[in-house]
Amino acid sequence: AQLNCANDSTGLIPITDLGTDFYEGTWQGGLYQGGVNTPPTGHLNKGIGIVKKLKPLDTLGNVNYATGKIVLAGFGASTVGGPFNHMILLMKDYTDLNPCMKAVNSANGSDGITAMTIGNDEYWDYIRDFKLAEKDLTPIQVQVGWLMHSSRIDSNGSEVNGYVDTLVKRFTVALNAMQYYYPNLKLVYVSGFPYGGYADPTKALYHVIKEPSSYHHNFAVKELIRRQISGDPTLKYKEPGKQVPYLIWGPPLWADGKNPREYDGLTWNCETEFAIDGGGYHLTNEGKDKLANILLNFFRTDTLSESWFMDGPKWASCGDGRFADGSIIAPEETIITKEDITVFPNPSTGVFYVDFDEVLTAPIQIKVVNQIGEVVLSESYGSSQPFSFYQFNLTGKPAGVYYFEVLIGDKPFTQS
């Protein structure tokens, strides 16, 4: 199993650079119809009207400028969770963000977009109990989302038309469910996948990530938003009969591998930004930081997010005793759960990796123990290791079951 780092470009033109030209004769470039990267004025103005009405809500959904929050939630799988957590960490360094705003990783592990349906309470309960509740938040406080997701069951070769239509329908069902479980959700930014040319052909998700699948994914996002703008009743975002939140592009992420795109010079480097055994979709810490900075810069400057993401006079009453991301200064110790620690691949052929999803302020001790209780590997790390991605090598050790033990402060976790 390894990344296909030799496939560092495809020759495909990023949707942001394609302009008024067409892909496959049918799919015009640009993030929006007409081959442009800016939303239609009418749609943008409606979005401005929506965000002007955003107010901090308490856990019961009441407007409260003292303790309430405007929650920005990141939705998707682990490809969203890691970078979004890195963005939350970066936000600590800024003093000019809205103290009434709280960003929360609401991604749900390895589930695909087909799990995001009304009635699949297990999926939504997990987010409520392990993502929101641990931050003293409730679903009713979620008002803005960032979504990057795809289907794991719909294969895609070189054919784009059917794949785009299928994925748009998947998005529509998911967004309808998001509106159901988050009744105050007003606005969702949607991003297409980044470059997928480094995908590992031995991985189960290869068909989802490989090119041109990731490239096609961006046209699906464009078509989704186009249909809402064009008045598709299943994507209605206003009452009466609201079905989904207002949709607009989040940061566009697809660039042709190492080829800088004209739009902003973005590239994706296999060797430094993609995890060795991450399938071509899990990023290294460097890659997560890169995507986190893209997200943070986007929210700081976007026309629709600047008014509620950045600080201003209307948010002054939320400021005392809070960090820029809305968390309280000197909070109680973060509750770390088993879900915040990812060990992969499992099973392993000798080399495995550990990824911590939460900020870790306590010392970390990691041990690997064999079946008779012998410690075969032991490492210790200081308290300043947030969002760290570690590699461990058991090559040369006898095959069998090993137990991974991690001690964060005085709290132990074990996984075989």
PLM feature segments, named:
Residues 1-75, 79-89, 307-326:
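N-terminal secretory targeting modules
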Residues 335-344, 348-416:
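C-terminal outer-membrane/trafficking sorting elements
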Residues 24-42, 66-162:
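Conserved SGNH/GDSL esterase-like catalytic core that processes O-acyl groups on lipids
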Residues 82, 86-89, 162, 166-173, ...:
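Extracytoplasmic/secreted proteins, especially bacterial periplasmic and envelope-associated proteins
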Residues 80, 88-92, 132, 150, ...:
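Sec-exported extracytoplasmic/periplasmic mature domains
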Residues 49-60, 118-137, 166-176:
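A Trp-anchored, charged/polar loop motif used as the substrate-binding/catalytic surface
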Residues 195-326:
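Catalytic His-Asp segment of secreted/periplasmic serine-dependent ester chemistry enzymes
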